[in-house]
Amino acid sequence: MPPRPRFDRRAPVRELPNINDRIKYPQLRVVDADGTQLGVINREAALEVAQERELDLVLVSEKANPPVCRIMNYGKFKFEQEKKAKEAKKKSHQTEVKEVKMRYKIDQHDYEVRINQATRFLKAGDKVKCTVIFRGREIQHTNLAESLLARMAKDLEEQAEVQQTPKREGRNMIMFLTPRKTPLIKNEKEVTTSAKAERTIS
């Protein structure tokens, strides 16, 4: 019986960035930190310039002839690239409409579960459709459903704004919430405290 193939469980080798001594090309086209073209110089001279400026020599275009390097603060450059990637990912998030369903006769525990669900959706950047479902003659109590949705909007006001106030939709009562873009100042006391703090700082 042939031996069973072995699976390599080792973690994949992490590719290291081409900077400083890892750059092996003898001739390089070098761009200074301020964008000035230093022209084509040998590797040793390029490294010496980077060291004099207490910066890094970073390979930015390996396919060019000769390869192009830039003198920069690599740590800062990497941080900015990661920051831009995170922002791009955040902007690419497709807003969805998540639904939270309940009956107008809801106990406190179940209500808190719905509040937690809505909070999670809002923090993820999604809109929330709050739906109160009526059964049979319960449709006569739309006022209670409106009160429940108003209570929900109040409890979520720090995370959400009401995009659409409660209204009938078939045999349901619905309300739409959207993530709050600006922080909520609850009352005059907070406004006064905030103003005093600003005057103290200035």
Curated annotation (Swiss-Prot):
GO annotations of cellular component type: cytosol; membrane
Pfam families associated with the record: IF3_C, IF3_N
PROSITE patterns with a match to the protein in the record: IF3
Domain of life per record: Bacteria
Subcellular location: Cytoplasm
Chief place where the protein resides: cytoplasm
GO terms, molecular function: ribosome binding; translation initiation factor activity
Cytoplasm listed as a keyword: yes
Keyword Transmembrane helix: no
Gene Ontology biological process terms, A to Z: ribosome disassembly
Keywords per UniProt: Cytoplasm, Initiation factor, Protein biosynthesis
HAMAP family (UniProt xref): IF_3
Free-text function comment from the UniProt entry: IF-3 binds to the 30S ribosomal subunit and shifts the equilibrium between 70S ribosomes and their 50S and 30S subunits in favor of the free subunits, thus enhancing the availability of 30S subunits on which protein synthesis initiation begins.
Assigned protein family: Belongs to the IF-3 family.
Assembly and oligomerization: Monomer.
Protein's UniProt name: Translation initiation factor IF-3
Gene that this polypeptide is encoded by: infC
